[in-house]
Amino acid sequence: MARIAGIDLPNNKQLQIALTSIYGIGRARALEICEKTGVLPDKRAKELDNDEVNKLRKIIESDYVVEGKLRSELAMSIKRLMDIACYRGLRHRKGLPLRGQRTKTNARTRKGKRKTVANKKMASK
């Protein structure tokens, strides 16, 4: 089982798909990595030899920001927005959509489950 960037690649999948199990690598980037290293993207992960795994590991660690470092960079950029109190930072802090979507209705994913107002039905009668 190949281990790259702290992640065990799934053995039975093609390399181009197996690489997407690493956070920060999608299909396009996986194909790009395969092209740089000269490894066939259709090859199964279990068929890789140590030399090919080392090539992949070297390219990924040197050229790309993946896994924990990428997660921390994203968290730091969001924290920076909140610290400078710009519009996007305030929206992050309040848990509302950032990019101009309506919030009177919809926006349920960002706002979370509905918070019901107690006794609203009884008061209206």
UniProtKB/Swiss-Prot annotation:
<comment type="subunit">
    <text>Part of the 30S ribosomal subunit. Forms a loose heterodimer with protein S19. Forms two bridges to the 50S subunit in the 70S ribosome.</text>
</comment>
<dbReference type="InterPro" id="IPR010979">
    <property type="entry name" value="Ribosomal_uS13-like_H2TH"/>
</dbReference>
<protein>
    <recommendedName>
        <fullName>Small ribosomal subunit protein uS13</fullName>
    </recommendedName>
</protein>
<dbReference type="GO" id="GO:0003735">
    <property type="term" value="F:structural constituent of ribosome"/>
</dbReference>
<keyword id="KW-0689">Ribosomal protein</keyword>
<dbReference type="GO" id="GO:0005829">
    <property type="term" value="C:cytosol"/>
</dbReference>
<dbReference type="GO" id="GO:0019843">
    <property type="term" value="F:rRNA binding"/>
</dbReference>
<keyword id="KW-0694">RNA-binding</keyword>
<dbReference type="InterPro" id="IPR001892">
    <property type="entry name" value="Ribosomal_uS13"/>
</dbReference>
<keyword id="KW-0820">tRNA-binding</keyword>
<feature type="region of interest" description="Disordered">
    <location>
        <begin position="97"/>
        <end position="125"/>
    </location>
</feature>
<dbReference type="GO" id="GO:0006412">
    <property type="term" value="P:translation"/>
</dbReference>
<dbReference type="InterPro" id="IPR027437">
    <property type="entry name" value="Rbsml_uS13_C"/>
</dbReference>
<comment type="similarity">
    <text>Belongs to the universal ribosomal protein uS13 family.</text>
</comment>
<dbReference type="InterPro" id="IPR019980">
    <property type="entry name" value="Ribosomal_uS13_bac-type"/>
</dbReference>
<keyword id="KW-0687">Ribonucleoprotein</keyword>
<dbReference type="InterPro" id="IPR018269">
    <property type="entry name" value="Ribosomal_uS13_CS"/>
</dbReference>
<keyword id="KW-0699">rRNA-binding</keyword>
<dbReference type="Pfam" id="PF00416">
    <property type="entry name" value="Ribosomal_S13"/>
</dbReference>
<dbReference type="GO" id="GO:0015935">
    <property type="term" value="C:small ribosomal subunit"/>
</dbReference>
<comment type="function">
    <text>Located at the top of the head of the 30S subunit, it contacts several helices of the 16S rRNA. In the 70S ribosome it contacts the 23S rRNA (bridge B1a) and protein L5 of the 50S subunit (bridge B1b), connecting the 2 subunits; these bridges are implicated in subunit movement. Contacts the tRNAs in the A and P-sites.</text>
</comment>
<dbReference type="GO" id="GO:0000049">
    <property type="term" value="F:tRNA binding"/>
</dbReference>
